[in-house]
Structures are given as structure tokens and as C-alpha cells.
Amino acid sequence: MLLPILAICMGASVGALARWGLALWFGAGGFMPWGTLAANLVGGYLVGVAIASFHLLPDLDPAWRLALVTGFLGGLTTFSSFSAEVVTMLLEGRPGVALLTAAAHLGGSLFLTWLGIRSVQALAA
């Protein structure tokens, strides 16, 4: 029971630091919170890569899956920040930007998850 907990904690720590790094790199303010969008889009792509890779590696230790998906990608991506940012835009009277931000996160993440799966499938073919 200790190994899964450690795997998740280690992955989550690295993912959260990566998200923080993206927020610093993209900076605050501007048209839309680009760091949060980048974290969610990168996470969407990487979860697709992980899904397809795990399919090709059925004997992979479950601790790796926990570390990568539950831990790292759980720490990297952020639904709570996304929600807070969109609601703040609505409260500030910027419904168009709020809608665009929500569409970019949702549509972009779904597309990149699909692209991640297709990327691994193409490389494995």
C-alpha cells in the first residue's frame, strides 16, 4: 500500500511544480491565463500518450500508471484554477473571453488527448 501512495505523491509533486513553472513562464494578466491553458492542453496530450502507451505495455507496473496519470498529470492539470478564472471573467463582465477560455480548455484538451493517442499509434505502427 505504501508504493502506490509514494508513486502518486512523487508524480503529483513534479506535476504541481511543472504547472507553477508554466504559470511563471507565461506570466499573469493579459487576455487569458495562458499558463493554466498550457498546463491543461499539455496534460490533455500527455494523458492520450499515456493511455495509448499503457495499452502497448500491459505488463507495466501499476505504480508507474499511478505516478504518471494520477500523480503527475493530476498535479499538472487544474480544473479548479480554470473554473476560478472563467468565473472571474464572468464577474468582470467579460462573457466573450470567458466562453472563449472555456472552449479553448475543453475543446483543446479533448483534441490533444485524441492527438496523443494517435501519435503513439502512429509511432507503434
Curated annotation (Swiss-Prot):
What is the protein's membrane topology class?
A: Multi-pass membrane protein
**Substrates-to-products reaction catalysed:** fluoride(in) = fluoride(out)
- Entry keyword annotation includes Cytoplasm: no
Q: What biological processes does GO assign it?
A: cellular detoxification of fluoride
Q: Which GO terms of the cellular component aspect does the record hold?
A: plasma membrane
Q: What is its main location?
A: membrane
Q: Which residues bind Na(+)?
A: G74, T77
**Does Metal-binding count among this protein's keywords?**
yes
One Pfam family, please name it.
CRCB
What does UniProt list under activity regulation?
Answer: Na(+) is not transported, but it plays an essential structural role and its presence is essential for fluoride channel function.
Q: Which UniProt keywords apply?
A: Cell inner membrane, Cell membrane, Ion channel, Ion transport, Membrane, Metal-binding, Sodium, Transmembrane, Transmembrane helix, Transport
Q: Where in the cell is it found?
A: Cell inner membrane
Q: Which residues cross the membrane?
A: 5-25, 37-57, 71-91, 97-117
State the Gene Ontology terms under molecular function.
Answer: fluoride channel activity; metal ion binding
What protein family does this chain belong to?
Belongs to the fluoride channel Fluc/FEX (TC 1.A.43) family.
Q: Describe the task this protein carries out.
A: Fluoride-specific ion channel. Important for reducing fluoride concentration in the cell, thus reducing its toxicity.
By what name is this protein known?
Fluoride-specific ion channel FluC
Gene name of the record: fluC
